[in-house]
Amino acid sequence: MHVRYPLLAALALSIGAAMPATAETVVRYGISMADVPLTTGQPDRGAGGYQFTGYTIYDPLVAWEMNIADRPGKLVPGLATEWKVDDTDKKKWRFTLRKGVKFHDGSDFTADAVIWNFDKVLNDKAPQFDKRQSAQVKTRLPSVASYAKIDDSTIEVTTKAVDSLFPYQMLWFLVSSPAQYEKVGKDWDKFAMSPSGTGPFKLTKLVPRELAELTKNADYWDKARIPKTDKLVLVPMPEALTRTNALLAGQVDLIETPAPDAVPQLKSAGMKIVDNVTPHVWNYHLSVLPGSPWTDVRLRKALNLAIDRDAVVALMNGLAKPAIGQVDPSSPWFGKPTFKIKYDLAEAKKLVKEAGYSPEKPLKATFIIANGGTGQMLSLPINEFLQQSFKEIGVEIDFKVVELEVLYTAWRKGAADESMAGITANNIAYVTSDPLYAIVRFFDSRQVAPVGVNWGGYKNPKVDALIDEAKQTFDASKQDELIAQADSLIVDDAPLVWVVHDTNPHALSPKVKKFVQAQHWFQDLTTIGTE
C-alpha cells in the first residue's frame, strides 16, 4: 500500500525547522490529533492530551506509574510526597508537598501555587480563573468541596462526602506557574505560547496545528524521569495513513495508532510495532432520557448482540480486543453479569422485532461521532462497519461527524442539552484505568452531565448505593468487590454499546531504541530515546 500526501512535504519543512543544527538528539512523534492539545496546564482533546502537553510540561500532586510494561501501574507520589485521610474526619485529605521544586521560569513550587491552581479551575470569581482549563478538569474533580493551605508545604482538600477513591481524581489536576502568568500579563493565550510548569520537558516552540517542540528539563526534580532525548517534536496528524506514510518517508520517528492494514508494510520496512493491555473501551454511550428509543433495554441489548467483534478486531489488524463490558475480564472490577455480550444476530433481530421494528420497518437514529483522534482508533471505518451491522437487525443509524474536541464538548454537555436535539448516542472512547474512570463518572446518577460525564442520563439506585459503599471503605479488596457488583448491574442494563478495547499501538522507526509501552492510556514520553 503506497498512498502519497502533498501535505507531507509541507510537514517535512515545518518539522525540519524545529530541529537544531547541533548534535542534540531529536525524536519527531506523529500524534493522532488535529492540533496540539492545550498547553496552559489542563490539556484539552481528552485523556490522550495529558500524555502530550500534560505530564510532559506539568506534574500532578498524585501521579500514575507509567514507566513499566509488565503490569498495571499504580498511584505514586508526584508533587505531593504523601497524602492521607484525616482519622477523625474522612472528608479531609492532607497533601504534603515536595520541597525544593521549581517551575521552569525559576519560581518556587509552593502551597500558595497549589491553591492558586485550584482557584484557576474551580473558582470562577478568581482573577486567574480560566474557563477553558476549567472545562477540561472540573468534571474530573467531582468530589472537591473546598481546599486550604495549612502551611508552606501542606494543603488540605475537603471532599463533599467520604470518598476513598478521591486520590484518583488528583491525577488530573496539574500545576501551572503563577509567576509566569503574571509575567505574560495575566493572559492565558500568551501563557499557552510560553508556559511554565514543573515537568520533565519545557515547551520551547509551538506552532498551532503544526508542531510543539518539547525540550528536556535537565534540572527536573525526579532524576529517574529526566527525558532520554534532548528534544521531542509533537506533530499533529489525525489521519492514520498520513502518520503511517510520514513514518515510512522518514519525516517522523514514531507514531501512535498506525494504519492497521499497513502493519505488514511497516514491519517489512524495519519498523517496530508495540502495543500492550490497555484500560480503554470503544463504545456508544446511549441516551436513556425520555423520548430516546434506547429507553427500551431490548434495543440496547440488541445493539450489543448485533456486533461481530472479531471482525472489528480484524479491521484493526489485530490491534484491538473484543469488549464484553465496560472493563476487560482481567480487571478486578469485572463483575458477573447475567447479560452475556456476544455476536448473536438471531437474538438481536428477535429483540428488535419485540420492540416493534425490523429491517422492513427500521428504527432510525442519529449518533454523534469523531472524524478521528487519540483513543478513537479507526473512527470512521469502525463506525461504518457497525452502521451496516445494525442495519441488518432493523436499526438505521445516521452519523453527525465532528472534530474530536467538538465531540468532547458535546459529551460534557450531555444528551439533555439542546445542542443534542435528535442525537441519541455519543461515541467518545475513554480510559477505564481506575474505579472513578471505569464506573463512577459514567454511571453514578449524581454525575449526569453537565455535572459529570454520565452523558446519557443513566440512573440505577442499586448502582449508586454500591458506589457510595465503595467510596466509604478504605479496604482496597472490598472496594474492588463492590465496584465489580456495580459493573454486573451496569452490563445487565446495557446503557452502552461496548465494542472493543484498544491496545494503544505505536510504530517506531529503527532510530528509536527506547520506549516503554505502559499498560495504560497514558504513556511516559520521557522513556523515548535514540540510544
Segments and roles (model prediction):
Residues R4, T96, I115, S134-Y181, ...:
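Surface-exposed binding/hinge segments that line
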Residues I31-T88, S196:
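N-terminal lobe/hinge region of extracytoplasmic solute-binding protein
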Residues E65-D70, L171-P227, E239, A346, ...:
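Gly/Pro-rich hinge or "lid" segments in bacterial periplasmic/extracellular proteins
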Residues E82-P127, E156, P293-T295:
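Aromatic- and charge-enriched surface segment that lines or borders ligand/interaction sites
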Residues D189-A192, D219-Q265:
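Ligand-site clamp/hinge motif
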Residues E213-A218, K267, T295-E392, D398, ...:
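Append "and occasionally in soluble cytosolic enzymes with long acidic Gly/Pro-rich linkers
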Residues K301, V313, I393-T409, Y437-S509, ...:
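Extracytoplasmic/peripheral linker and loop segments enriched in polar/acidic and small residues
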Residues H506-E531:
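Long beta-strand-rich cores associated with HINT superfamily self-processing modules
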